Amino acid sequence: MPYSSLHPSIPQPRGLRAQVAALVLLGACLVALWGLGELPEYTLRWLVLHLASQQIGLLVKGLCSLAEELCHVHSRYQSSYWRAARACLGCPIRCGALLLLSCYFYFSIRDKAGLPLPWMLALLGLSQALNILLGLQHLAPAEVSAICEKRNFNVAHGLAWSYYIGYLRLILPGLRARIQAYNQRHKNVLGGIGNHRLHILFPLDCGVPDDLSVADPNIRFLHELPQQSADRAGIKGRVYTNSIYELLENGQPAGVCVLGYATPLQTLFAMSQDGRAGFSREDRLEQAKLFCRTLEDILADAPEAQNNCRLIVYQEPTEGGSFSLSQEILRHLRQEEREVTMGSAETSVVPTSSTLSQEPELLISGMEQPLPLRSDIF
């Protein structure tokens, strides 16, 4: 399933454009240095000195961070000082190698530059102290967002996995059996194409009313599917249920489907309304989009979700625009009908004249008894 197929506003994963821009910058700087006419040895000397200063400065910054982490070594690092040091300074082998190389080039080039050692060390300490106290090297919001997405630190990532493991993975495997049981008692109400799926509504503004008729009066509650129960987290016979809704168009019934909102969106909305969460409306919109994308990725690889659910992602227009939720759902239902019809047309095999003109062949197996026609007996 391609990215942003559900809604055009859902962002794609970040690529390598920052590295490409850095490569272009590298080429431009090399051309500029070549145009200035400086000797390569002179440029290399100061470049190595600058890189060595950066590495020593990062070591000083890590030591300052270690002073704080040592106060939490028992609660955060299971009483392991080694883990606390690695969290602040990184891999010891890499850190030691960079430190040795940096010190070697730093002290050898410093002598040629004629700069006193105490002055340069004091300058390094001063610069790092100002960076920490004044926050001069804070990450940009885009960098923080990229790190959180890459390391799966987002609120949306946890909500998507919780929704899948705690709900969808439990109800989707038995959904078709429950729909069949419902159809037997209600004259095949859900017998249409696409009606065997769970349709999950995803409003990107996270506005999730408890009653769907409040969102659109053309959505009318019809029945409940047969309940499903399971022992879950110490709760015996926990009940899971799904609702069936009838969709009206021009006052007449136009469709029936199993429908419901993605409940974690209520959590995102409540967080944006509670000042203690520190969650702005912009954060809510970003996390809602990432939640939808993450859930889409999860369901794409989940065998129990294949053809059993459909995500309906929409964003209501601002004031002055017209939007009908019932029409959006009907559009998806009709699209499902077209997809199923086209799929069945492609899979149907029409025998060609050359095939029909061949002489019939008898395929005789070496087994003494004929095999049954049903393969699921084995």
UniProtKB/Swiss-Prot annotation:
GO biological process: activation of innate immune response; autophagosome assembly; cGAS/STING signaling pathway; defense response to virus; innate immune response; positive regulation of interferon-beta production; positive regulation of macroautophagy; positive regulation of type I interferon production
Positions bound to 3',3'-c-di-GMP: S162, Y167, R238, V239, Y240, T241, T263
Tissue expression profile of the protein: Expressed at higher level in the spleen, lymph node, lung and bone marrow, followed by the small intestine, heart, liver and brain, and to a lesser extent in the stomach and kidney.
Record motif pLxIS motif, residues: 362-365
Cytoplasmic side: 1-17, 70-91, 135-378
Glycyl lysine isopeptide (Lys-Gly) (interchain with G-Cter in ubiquitin), cross-linked positions: K150, K236
Gene behind the chain: STING1
Presence of keyword Transcription regulation: no
Residues bearing PTM Phosphoserine: S354, S357, S365
Binding of 2',3'-cGAMP, residues: S162, Y167, R238, T263
Organism taxonomic ancestry: Eukaryota, Metazoa, Chordata, Craniata, Vertebrata
Annotated Gene Ontology cellular component terms: autophagosome; autophagosome membrane; cytoplasm; cytoplasmic vesicle; endoplasmic reticulum membrane; endoplasmic reticulum-Golgi intermediate compartment membrane; Golgi membrane; mitochondrial outer membrane
Leader sequence residues: none
Protein purpose: Facilitator of innate immune signaling that acts as a sensor of cytosolic DNA from bacteria and viruses and promotes the production of type I interferon (IFN-alpha and IFN-beta). Innate immune response is triggered in response to non-CpG double-stranded DNA from viruses and bacteria delivered to the cytoplasm. Acts by binding cyclic dinucleotides: recognizes and binds cyclic di-GMP (c-di-GMP), a second messenger produced by bacteria, cyclic UMP-AMP (2',3'-cUAMP), and cyclic GMP-AMP (cGAMP), a messenger produced by CGAS in response to DNA virus in the cytosol.
Modified residues (Phosphothreonine): T355
Protein name: Stimulator of interferon genes protein
Post-translational modification: Phosphorylation by TBK1 leads to activation and production of IFN-beta. Following cyclic nucleotide (c-di-GMP or cGAMP)-binding, activation and translocation from the endoplasmic reticulum, STING1 is phosphorylated by TBK1 at Ser-365 in the pLxIS motif. The phosphorylated pLxIS motif constitutes an IRF3-binding motif, leading to recruitment of the transcription factor IRF3 to induce type-I interferons and other cytokines. Phosphorylated on tyrosine residues upon MHC-II aggregation. Dephosphorylation by PPP6C leads to inactivation and decreased production of IFN-beta.
Subcellular location per the Swiss-Prot or TrEMBL entry: Endoplasmic reticulum membrane; Cytoplasm, Perinuclear region; Endoplasmic reticulum-Golgi intermediate compartment membrane; Golgi apparatus membrane
Organism: Sus scrofa
Subunit structure: Homodimer; forms a homodimer in absence of cyclic nucleotide (c-di-GMP or cGAMP); 'Lys-63'-linked ubiquitination at Lys-150 is required for homodimerization. Homotetramer; in presence of cyclic nucleotide (c-di-GMP or cGAMP), forms tetramers and higher-order oligomers through side-by-side packing. Interacts (when phosphorylated) with IRF3; following activation and phosphorylation on the pLxIS motif by TBK1, recruits IRF3. Interacts with DDX58/RIG-I, MAVS and SSR2. Interacts with RNF5 and TRIM56. Interacts with TBK1; when homodimer, leading to subsequent production of IFN-beta.
Main subcellular location: endoplasmic reticulum
Lumenal side: 35-44, 107-116
Keyword hit for Ion transport: yes
PANTHER family assigned to the protein according to its UniProt record, in alphabetical order: STIMULATOR OF INTERFERON GENES PROTEIN (PTHR34339:SF1)
Region of interest called Cyclic dinucleotide-binding domain (CBD), as start-end residue ranges on this chain: 153-339
Family affiliation: Belongs to the STING family.
The entry's keywords: Autophagy, Cell membrane, Cytoplasm, Cytoplasmic vesicle, Endoplasmic reticulum, Golgi apparatus, Host-virus interaction, Immunity, Innate immunity, Ion channel, Ion transport, Isopeptide bond, Lipoprotein, Membrane, Mitochondrion, Mitochondrion outer membrane, Nucleotide-binding, Palmitate, Phosphoprotein, Transmembrane, Transmembrane helix, Transport, Ubl conjugation
Residues where 2',3'-cUAMP binds: Y167, R238, T263
